[in-house]
């Protein structure tokens, strides 16, 4: 009967009360229990008062109670019903995790990298195209400007009258002047013959008869000096040798052959424009002047240049498709 009464009394006590009674029977204080269990005094007090701290998980609280029971020699099986009430197991709240696998993150990163790479590539291509278009447009404008200038200069040259016939008429006048003294001498020689008459009657008869004979004499005498005589100090013209001799070749001659239409401007050392204008396909140009020559060529691929008998290299202008600006020195060293 006494054993059953004691068992019923123990069941009536809570877990904290039973632990406190056992501690007091052993003569231990809350400080001593806390030191042995490595707990705070407040935690031991909460356990004896059947309080569950909010910041303490139920799993840890059940472990502390079991350690406390072993310390005060109380069987753990007797405390299990009370533990279910004092420290019930609470399901931990687990937040649903987002399924971001490593493969998906890597794929997303690679996608952004590819997008950025394509964007940079498009920007580079766009800038290159814009630069090429501006350079091409500037070259076309420059060629058009130079062509307009050359056409304007040609129009101005055509509008000015060139006295080409003056020299020829002067030469003709110089060629005909030596014959006039011969004619005067011929007439002078005829007049004394007419005046030396013995009597006036004969003179009158001669005046009536002589003019036809004088006309015959004059017509016969006049062509003879023109054909046989030359003025004093005048040298005969070498007409036969003029058609045979050829001018000497200038070592500074500039020879150009054109395979296509090309605009061209050539200036010598004195600043004189030897040529400025458009040359057609299959045309050729031979210029002489004072070296060095300054050349501007609109289409370098359409012209072949020979200077001092050697070809001039225009490959660097052909590769870049630019207007060629170069200077040909006396030693044939083209410089841009």
Curated annotation (Swiss-Prot):
HAMAP family: RodZ (MF_02017). Residues 165-201, 218-240 have a biased composition (Low complexity). It comes from Escherichia coli O7:K1 (strain IAI39 / ExPEC). The gene is rodZ. It comes from the Bacteria. InterPro entries: Bact_Cytoskel_RodZ, Cro/C1-type_HTH, Lambda_DNA-bd_dom_sf, RodZ, RodZ-like_C. It is found in: Cell inner membrane. It is a single-pass type II membrane protein. The helix-turn-helix (HTH) motif in the cytoplasmic domain of the N-terminus is involved in the formation of spirals to maintain the rigid rod shape. As this protein is anchored in the cytoplasmic membrane, the HTH motif may contribute to protein-protein interactions to form the RodZ helix, which is localized beneath the cytoplasmic membrane. The C-terminal domain may be critical for determination of the rod shape by probably interacting with enzymes required for synthesis of the peptidoglycan layer, including PBPs in the periplasm. Residues 1-111 are cytoplasmic. The keyword Cell membrane applies. Residues 30-49 bind DNA. GO terms for molecular function: DNA binding. Its main location: membrane. The chain crosses the membrane at residues 112-132. Residues 19-71 form the HTH cro/C1-type domain. Belongs to the RodZ family. Keywords: Cell inner membrane, Cell membrane, Cell shape, DNA-binding, Membrane, Signal-anchor, Transmembrane, Transmembrane helix. This is Cytoskeleton protein RodZ.
